Amino acid sequence: MSTQNSAYSAFSSLLAEAAMPVSPAELHGHLLGRVCAGAGFDEAAWQHAAAELLGGAPGERLKAALSGLLGMVRQDFSAGEVAVVMLLPDDETPLAQRTEALGQWCQGFLAGFGLTAREGSLTGEAEEVLQDMAAIAQVQGQLEDSEDGETDYMEVMEYLRVAPLLLFAECGKPLEPAPKPSLH
């Protein structure tokens, strides 16, 4: 089982236990959308936004998991990665469920991005990325469970792994570099 799937399963369980009406994919997409729109990596602001999305204050275990999710996203952006890690079901999950989760991820991203105040207008390229995400959010369940469907899903997922980086470069707050130790 991959780390990505372990995190997805863990979040699914936590959200189900707390009777929260949000999928792990939507939650992760929401966080990434906020970060890419310029919300930064403030823990308190993320916990507040997550509580609003979840429809109530999360319990301690879920709060800790939300903090870990923020750390994972921060790591993606601070490590100079060329793609983000998406919180989605593994490849063994039926294609229809993976496609639904991908659509939920896009919905969450668009909501997080849209709810975050930004300065200035977007470039045409950034607007195109957001339009693509809106279209992908509507595709839920429309891919056939076939080799072509798998190929289409993988291509869309790979696109979505790099698309947030363009939006982050345009709108996101630069990461604060870690303080360098002083030598005495």
Curated annotation (Swiss-Prot):
Species assigned in the record: Pseudomonas aeruginosa (strain ATCC 15692 / DSM 22644 / CIP 104116 / JCM 14847 / LMG 12228 / 1C / PRS 101 / PAO1)
A Pfam family it matches: UPF0149
InterPro entries documented for this protein: YgfB-like, YgfB-like_sf
GO cellular component labels: cytosol
Protein name per its UniProtKB record: UPF0149 protein PA5225
Database matches in NCBIfam families: PRK02166.1 (NF002562)
The family this protein is said to belong to: Belongs to the UPF0149 family.
